Amino acid sequence: MSATALVTEFLLAAEEGNIDALKACLEKGVDINVTNRQKRTAIIIASLKKHYACVEFLIAAGADIDKQDQTCFNPFLISCLTNDLTLLRIVLPADPDLDRLTRFGGVGITPASEKGHVEIVRELLEKTDINVNHTNFVGWTPLLEAIVVNDGGAKQQEIVKLLLDHGANPHMTDKYGKTPLELAREKGFNAIADLLLAAGA
């Protein structure tokens, strides 16, 4: 089998969730971190497809869990973006780099806060030392994202409370100098404004 055919077979095995085929390709000498045209490794493909047993197998076999594809996805960031708590719990013990950025310059907790992924946010805050005050490319912290980009509903209120309880700075402004409290009030998110006030905003 040619090297190219072996790579194709390996990445297809990840796509299909076929551990035996992954194992066979590795035994034939395929590079575990080889990528397709989108710069996706087998572990990124398996993560996107929710083939959890394959992800576990590839971690145990030494796959690079931090390598990112051309849209900045890696297993850790995929779990945060897609609300995949199972994947997150598989990846965290492998000690992923929590400072890897999404294509918008956020860390994992940034999109999770924005999208209302309560359990992901809770897991990150309770199990990791991820930077709760990281500022992304547009100048927003996870707290600002949780307020500005969503509907202010129950999930967002819970996320705001979790962030504040774990050290989110209620005084960090956006790039226009607006505080979380000002933004919450502008949007009519009174419950979030109350949480911010209780946290000393």
Task: State each model region's role.
Residues 23-31, 56-64, 89-97, 122-131, ...:
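Ankyrin repeat domain, specifically the short helix-to-loop turn at the C-terminus of the second helix
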Residues 1-28, 37-40, 60:
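Intrinsically disordered, low-complexity regulatory segments in ankyrin-centric signaling systems
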